[in-house]
Design a protein with these regions (language model features):
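Conserved catalytic core of nucleotide polymerization and phosphodiester-bond processing enzymes
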Residues: 1-137
Protein backbone atom coordinates (compact mmCIF):
# COMPACT_ATOMS: atom_id res chain seq x y z
CA UNK A 1 0.00 0.00 0.00
CA UNK A 2 1.32 3.43 -0.90
CA UNK A 3 1.11 5.76 2.05
CA UNK A 4 1.96 9.44 2.60
CA UNK A 5 5.51 8.43 3.57
CA UNK A 6 5.95 7.29 -0.05
CA UNK A 7 5.05 10.69 -1.56
CA UNK A 8 7.92 11.95 -3.65
CA UNK A 9 9.35 8.44 -4.00
CA UNK A 10 10.42 7.62 -7.52
CA UNK A 11 10.00 4.20 -9.08
CA UNK A 12 11.91 4.39 -12.34
CA UNK A 13 10.17 7.09 -14.40
CA UNK A 14 7.20 7.27 -12.00
CA UNK A 15 6.81 9.51 -8.99
CA UNK A 16 4.28 8.87 -6.24
CA UNK A 17 2.21 11.85 -5.19
CA UNK A 18 -0.82 12.27 -2.97
CA UNK A 19 -3.65 10.34 -4.65
CA UNK A 20 -1.78 10.17 -7.95
CA UNK A 21 1.09 8.66 -9.87
CA UNK A 22 3.09 11.18 -11.88
CA UNK A 23 4.16 10.00 -15.32
CA UNK A 24 7.40 10.93 -17.12
CA UNK A 25 5.61 13.38 -19.45
CA UNK A 26 4.25 15.43 -16.55
CA UNK A 27 0.74 13.99 -16.64
CA UNK A 28 -0.70 12.02 -13.73
CA UNK A 29 -2.97 9.10 -13.10
CA UNK A 30 -5.32 10.31 -10.39
CA UNK A 31 -7.06 8.19 -7.81
CA UNK A 32 -9.00 10.65 -5.61
CA UNK A 33 -9.44 9.57 -2.01
CA UNK A 34 -7.52 6.33 -2.68
CA UNK A 35 -7.62 3.92 0.21
CA UNK A 36 -7.21 0.23 0.92
CA UNK A 37 -10.00 -1.55 2.75
CA UNK A 38 -11.25 -5.11 2.98
CA UNK A 39 -8.63 -6.41 0.56
CA UNK A 40 -9.32 -3.94 -2.25
CA UNK A 41 -8.39 -0.45 -3.37
CA UNK A 42 -11.18 2.10 -3.35
CA UNK A 43 -11.24 5.60 -4.82
CA UNK A 44 -13.90 8.16 -5.57
CA UNK A 45 -14.85 9.69 -8.92
CA UNK A 46 -17.67 11.99 -10.02
CA UNK A 47 -19.67 8.85 -10.80
CA UNK A 48 -19.18 7.46 -7.31
CA UNK A 49 -17.02 4.91 -5.54
CA UNK A 50 -14.77 2.68 -7.65
CA UNK A 51 -13.45 -0.60 -6.30
CA UNK A 52 -10.35 -2.04 -7.91
CA UNK A 53 -7.29 -4.16 -7.15
CA UNK A 54 -3.52 -3.87 -7.47
CA UNK A 55 -3.07 -5.56 -10.86
CA UNK A 56 -5.63 -3.24 -12.47
CA UNK A 57 -3.74 -0.21 -11.13
CA UNK A 58 -0.52 -1.69 -12.52
CA UNK A 59 -2.26 -2.19 -15.88
CA UNK A 60 -3.32 1.47 -15.86
CA UNK A 61 0.31 2.53 -15.34
CA UNK A 62 1.58 0.22 -18.10
CA UNK A 63 -1.04 1.45 -20.57
CA UNK A 64 -0.25 5.07 -19.73
CA UNK A 65 3.48 4.52 -20.26
CA UNK A 66 2.85 2.73 -23.57
CA UNK A 67 0.65 5.61 -24.69
CA UNK A 68 3.42 8.10 -23.90
CA UNK A 69 5.91 6.05 -25.93
CA UNK A 70 3.69 5.80 -29.04
CA UNK A 71 2.63 9.45 -28.81
CA UNK A 72 6.23 10.66 -28.61
CA UNK A 73 7.13 8.43 -31.56
CA UNK A 74 4.16 9.74 -33.52
CA UNK A 75 5.27 13.32 -32.94
CA UNK A 76 8.77 12.48 -34.18
CA UNK A 77 7.37 10.78 -37.29
CA UNK A 78 5.08 13.77 -37.84
CA UNK A 79 8.16 16.03 -37.82
CA UNK A 80 9.58 14.21 -40.85
CA UNK A 81 8.98 16.47 -43.87
CA UNK A 82 8.35 13.55 -46.23
CA UNK A 83 5.28 12.10 -44.45
CA UNK A 84 1.98 13.09 -42.91
CA UNK A 85 0.72 11.08 -39.95
CA UNK A 86 -2.96 10.38 -40.61
CA UNK A 87 -3.91 7.75 -38.04
CA UNK A 88 -2.75 6.02 -34.90
CA UNK A 89 -4.35 2.76 -33.75
CA UNK A 90 -3.07 1.08 -30.58
CA UNK A 91 0.59 0.43 -31.44
CA UNK A 92 0.39 1.48 -35.11
CA UNK A 93 1.27 4.76 -36.76
CA UNK A 94 -0.18 5.22 -40.24
CA UNK A 95 1.42 7.88 -42.41
CA UNK A 96 1.08 9.04 -46.01
CA UNK A 97 4.08 9.78 -48.14
CA UNK A 98 5.44 9.71 -51.64
CA UNK A 99 6.28 6.44 -53.38
CA UNK A 100 9.61 8.06 -54.20
CA UNK A 101 12.22 6.85 -51.68
CA UNK A 102 9.54 5.05 -49.66
CA UNK A 103 12.08 2.47 -48.43
CA UNK A 104 14.31 5.23 -47.05
CA UNK A 105 11.34 6.93 -45.40
CA UNK A 106 10.17 3.63 -43.90
CA UNK A 107 13.63 3.04 -42.46
CA UNK A 108 13.54 6.49 -40.80
CA UNK A 109 10.14 5.71 -39.29
CA UNK A 110 11.27 2.30 -38.03
CA UNK A 111 14.40 3.81 -36.46
CA UNK A 112 12.21 6.31 -34.60
CA UNK A 113 9.90 3.56 -33.38
CA UNK A 114 12.80 1.34 -32.25
CA UNK A 115 14.44 4.10 -30.19
CA UNK A 116 13.58 3.91 -26.48
CA UNK A 117 12.53 7.09 -24.67
CA UNK A 118 15.10 9.03 -22.65
CA UNK A 119 13.30 8.14 -19.41
CA UNK A 120 13.70 4.39 -20.06
CA UNK A 121 16.76 3.84 -22.23
CA UNK A 122 16.80 0.08 -21.62
CA UNK A 123 13.22 -0.44 -22.85
CA UNK A 124 13.36 -3.11 -25.56
CA UNK A 125 11.46 -1.83 -28.58
CA UNK A 126 11.08 -3.30 -32.02
CA UNK A 127 9.02 -2.27 -35.01
CA UNK A 128 7.95 -3.48 -38.39
CA UNK A 129 6.25 -1.68 -41.20
CA UNK A 130 5.28 -1.75 -44.79
CA UNK A 131 4.50 0.39 -47.78
CA UNK A 132 1.11 0.04 -49.43
CA UNK A 133 -1.24 1.92 -51.73
CA UNK A 134 -4.12 1.25 -49.30
CA UNK A 135 -4.35 0.71 -45.55
CA UNK A 136 -4.14 -2.95 -44.67
CA UNK A 137 -3.17 -5.04 -41.69
Amino acid sequence: MISPKDYGTEYGPLKVGPQRIELPNGMSLSYPDLRYADGEFIYTTQKGIVRTYGPRLAENVIQALARIVITDQMLEVHALPEVDVVLQVHDEIIALGSKLDSDVTMEKILNIMKTPPSWCTDLPLDAEGGVSQVYDK
